[in-house]
């Protein structure tokens, strides 16, 4: 069994050594331009077209939760990956717990009005503020996949009213489910906090725009943990300036790194992190990949395969 590996920033040698220990029967090598030798599996992140084109692979593993970079390249270069080759993504591998930490910490930050107290501190102003009531602080999760379900589970501990919106209806205990475009307005109408965990597909690009933001309650909050292309940044800035949106915590952006001239940097109601909400945990990723390859070799059914038409 031959495995090729490519990641533009990971410690390639570490990955190769750990993969060799986890899959001792495999010959694992770092892919370099010009390497056209045979391979059974490819482990990749933002791979060059040349790496995958024309190969008779058993499977490709994207080393992250999103596969939009591969799918966008496939649109421009359909020869990059044969339709018969299954594409897998890392559904969790430690990222779910990181998303839980990020989401819960920020929701509590807003619920306890720490954002307001920070602004008061900046002007040396001492003024206790009325508390928010938990029953009025509904959390809405856009996107009800693996990571969305993890975030919902963690927020249930804090007894916030929860709702989710997705393409198809979900049956999550304690979470009100909305499905389809026809139910999006009803979903948004009660969301004091909107957490975006949607996949990046043509149908979701620019979905968080003026029209969507206007359907939120006045003074709502936005937490974007998915992709920058989901948000029309000018529309968000306008909503922040008008007070329609009271605050935004943004981990992802249309352009990354976020340009220094972006007005988001200096906005008093925006908090920025550099795409770190959930980072691939190497040890857990290797465990998932090695188990999945073993299942594929035995002809067993596996989880995490991407539906290329849907984009996730």
Curated annotation (Swiss-Prot):
Its EC number is 1.1.1.79, 1.1.1.81. Coiled coil: none annotated. It catalyses: glycolate + NADP(+) = glyoxylate + NADPH + H(+); (R)-glycerate + NAD(+) = 3-hydroxypyruvate + NADH + H(+); (R)-glycerate + NADP(+) = 3-hydroxypyruvate + NADPH + H(+). Keywords: Cytoplasm, NAD, NADP, Oxidoreductase. Gene3D superfamilies: NAD(P)-binding Rossmann-like Domain. The gene is ghrA. It is found in: Cytoplasm. It comes from Escherichia coli O7:K1 (strain IAI39 / ExPEC). Catalyzes the NADPH-dependent reduction of glyoxylate and hydroxypyruvate into glycolate and glycerate, respectively. The active site is at residues 227, 275. GO terms for cellular component: cytosol. GO terms for molecular function: glyoxylate reductase (NADPH) activity; hydroxypyruvate reductase (NADH) activity; hydroxypyruvate reductase (NADPH) activity; NAD binding. This is Glyoxylate/hydroxypyruvate reductase A.
